[in-house]
Amino acid sequence: MADQRMDISSTISDFMSPGPTDLLSSSLGTSGVDCNRKRKGSSTDYQESMDTDKDDPHGRLEYTEHQGRIKNAREAHSQIEKRRRDKMNSFIDELASLVPTCNAMSRKLDKLTVLRMAVQHMKTLRGATNPYTEANYKPTFLSDDELKHLILRAADGFLFVVGCDRGKILFVSESAFKILNYSQNDLIGQSLFDYLHPKDIAKVKEQLSSSDTAPRERLIDAKTGLPVKTDITPGPSRLCSGARRSFFCRMKCNRPSVKVEDKDFPSTCSKKKDRKSFCTIHSTGYLKSWPPTKMGLDEDNEPDNEGCNLSCLVAIGRLHSHVVPQPVNGEIRVKSMEYVSRHAIDGKFVFVDQRATAILAYLPQELLGTSCYEYFHQDDIGHLAECHRQVLQTREKITTNCYKFKIKDGSFITLRSRWFSFMNPWTKEVEYIVSTNTVVLANVLEGGDPTFPQLTASPRSMDSMLPSGEGGPKRTHPTVPGIPGGTRAGAGKIGRMIAEEIMEIHRIRGSSPSSCGSSPLNITSTPPPDASSPGGKKILNGGTPDIPSSGLLSGQAQENPGYPYSDSSSILGENPHIGIDMIDNDQGSSSPSNDEAAMAVIMSLLEADAGLGGPVDFSDLPWPL
């Protein structure tokens, strides 16, 4: 019994003793009390520290700043968004006021529609924002009249202003008389449709209309998805300023005609003769609006305007260049075949146009470096040599007569050339000759072309310009076997002789005190009729004495009795030319000994002219003096 009592007491004691759960709860409770004590202590400490800071001025300032930061941080985000939305709405309203299509709407548009209309409006104005393309742009240094004359001169036409409502001509320049043969007073105030071809009136009315200035795209509201109805009413005041126009039309041309009365058919003839001809006019311009007061119009005389802007077409009319009147005889005039070449002062080709290949069959590189005299017919050399001298001495253009030019297959083609020389403005010397060569057809050659003035009759050949030996037979031109005849062998030297002649005249005239500042273009080297050379030989008009122009003779008196000149002051004072007989002699009796003798004489002459040698012995000269 005693043992049972001990077991029961132990069990009760175990049951009454605290378990692990009670220990955990007791521990948590103790820790919670400690934490609460710590929090209360920390808050109390912070409050005490803040109370101490309030007493300190520096701490009070920090406390105020801290409170301000807390207040700004607590500001509602909705207020910031509200201010942003207000700014965006104000900008969209301002944009809608700038777009004309938005202003014309009867109700307020949503934001997306306003933005889309603004984009469409910017697309229509693309390319017209450049200030240099605006209609109001004008250089500051030009007046209105000067600018108008410059535009008319550049356009080669006439300026006209036409009202878009009735087609009334409000202004036309005086240059319209050159094209239409109507004066300025005849056209101003009249209807443009009265001067148009009946079949072109509808086309011009379409160009004057303003149908294309209305919006072509249908606007859709972003909210409802329905098309937006615009309140824009088409009218003259809604024309798009700067709308370009370009069209062709036929206008009446008041050409004077002689009336021929026929008794048999009086009615038909009068109708045909009185019928006015038409010319094709290319009109380019733009539509523009002006106030009526700016145009100088009286509003009382125009009751339909009602104070609105006057819409006009400002354009320049030019005669269509492709419309060429055909000649009366029925022949079709085509553009003449021509090519341009440039020559050195001695006649050698330095540039040839590519069109020469189709005319002459030569490639440009085949002609470069060769003399033009090698291709001239021998009967035309005299005339062309005289033209060569003239073009080197004058500033004017020289037009040659018709001459024959040898082409690649050996035959000849008839050409006519315009020559002019280019003078270097600094050195005052001729640098090259420009030649425009035109092919002359057979019918033009027979009937004559009024565009090319004919020069005086030239000699048949160069030999007719030169003095032949007294009583001697006429010299025959040498021919080369295998080469077609017609050209002169060795004719390339002629251009070099003429160039040396002109240069020598320029040097002698330029060295004299009385002719300082003279240029080769102002020298007249053609001697008077029957002029005598220093040696006593007679020079025909346009002829040349048989003396070498390259022979620069000494200024001292020559003691050699074989030398024909005794007065050294008159040496080369006149026109020293080289005869073509010298070329023929050189061609016929050319030998190494003669060439060496000629070179020796030339070198002696050069030394004598420079004062380096004594009298020159002409006994070995192969040419007769």
UniProtKB/Swiss-Prot annotation:
Region (Interaction with CIART): 507-587
PTM field: Ubiquitinated, leading to its proteasomal degradation. Deubiquitinated by USP9X. O-glycosylated; contains O-GlcNAc. O-glycosylation by OGT prevents protein degradation by inhibiting ubiquitination. It also stabilizes the CLOCK-BMAL1 heterodimer thereby increasing CLOCK-BMAL1-mediated transcription of genes in the negative loop of the circadian clock such as PER1/2/3 and CRY1/2.
Record site feature (Important for interaction with CLOCK), residues: L125
Domain bHLH, chain residue ranges per copy: 72-125
Top-level taxonomy: Eukaryota, Metazoa, Chordata, Craniata, Vertebrata
Subunit structure, as described in the record: Component of the circadian clock oscillator which includes the CRY1/2 proteins, CLOCK or NPAS2, BMAL1 or BMAL2, CSNK1D and/or CSNK1E, TIMELESS and the PER1/2/3 proteins. Forms a heterodimer with CLOCK. The CLOCK-BMAL1 heterodimer is required for E-box-dependent transactivation, for CLOCK nuclear translocation and degradation, and, for phosphorylation of both CLOCK and BMAL1. Part of a nuclear complex which also includes RACK1 and PRKCA; RACK1 and PRKCA are recruited to the complex in a circadian manner. Interacts with NPAS2. Interacts with EZH2. Interacts with SUMO3. Interacts with SIRT1.
Region of interest called Disordered, as start-end residue ranges on this chain: 1-60, 454-491, 510-594
Gene label: BMAL1
Single Gene Ontology BP annotation: positive regulation of skeletal muscle cell differentiation
Residues that bear Phosphothreonine: T21
Annotated crosslink Glycyl lysine isopeptide (Lys-Gly) (interchain with G-Cter in SUMO2 and SUMO3) location: K252
Cited NCBIfam families: sensory_box (TIGR00229)
Modified residues (Phosphoserine): S17, S78, S90
Record cross-link Glycyl lysine isopeptide (Lys-Gly) (interchain with G-Cter in SUMO2), residues: K259
Disulfide bond annotation, renumbered to this chain: none
The protein, known as: Basic helix-loop-helix ARNT-like protein 1
Modified residues (N6-acetyllysine): K537
Compartment(s) where it occurs, according to its Swiss-Prot or TrEMBL record: Nucleus; Cytoplasm; Nucleus, PML body
Entries under PROSITE patterns matching the protein: BHLH, PAS
Gene3D superfamilies, sorted: Helix-loop-helix DNA-binding domain, PAS domain
GO MF term (any one): RNA polymerase II cis-regulatory region sequence-specific DNA binding
